[in-house]
């Protein structure tokens, strides 16, 4: 239940725009969020390995 309450809280627009911050759309993690995709690095890595992010592949050099 606490998770549902937090999700509802994040979806509301804040009173002042400076209070808004990025959170992962999948797990809700507040840190290490990639703005381009809107997800955290951990979720990004999982989705990239599954091939669910188009145009993304593992780097090797």
Curated annotation (Swiss-Prot):
The record's section on Pfam families has: Ribosomal_S14 (PF00253)
- GO molecular function of the protein, one example? zinc ion binding
- Per UniProt, where does Zn(2+) bind? 24, 27, 40, 43
What is any one GO biological process for this UniProt entry?
translation
- A GO CC term attached to the entry: cytoplasm
User: What keywords are assigned to this protein?
Assistant: Metal-binding, Ribonucleoprotein, Ribosomal protein, RNA-binding, rRNA-binding, Zinc
Alphabetical list of Gene3D superfamilies matching this protein: 30s Ribosomal Protein S14, Chain N (4.10.830.10)
Q: How is the cofactor bound?
A: Binds 1 zinc ion per subunit.
For activity, the cofactor(s) needed are: Zn(2+)
Question: How the protein assembles, per its UniProt entry?
Answer: Part of the 30S ribosomal subunit. Contacts proteins S3 and S10.
Free-text function comment from the UniProt entry = Binds 16S rRNA, required for the assembly of 30S particles and may also be responsible for determining the conformation of the 16S rRNA at the A site.
Descriptive protein name: Small ribosomal subunit protein uS14
Gene (UniProt): rpsZ
């Amino acid at each position: 239940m606490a998770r549902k309450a937090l999700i509802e809280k994040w979806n509301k627009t804040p009173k002042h725009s400076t209070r808004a911050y990025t959170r992962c759309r999948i797990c809700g993690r507040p840190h290490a969020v990639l703005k381009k995709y809107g997800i955290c690095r951990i979720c990004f890595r999982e989705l990239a390995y599954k091939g669910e992010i188009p145009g993304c592949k593992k780097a090797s050099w």
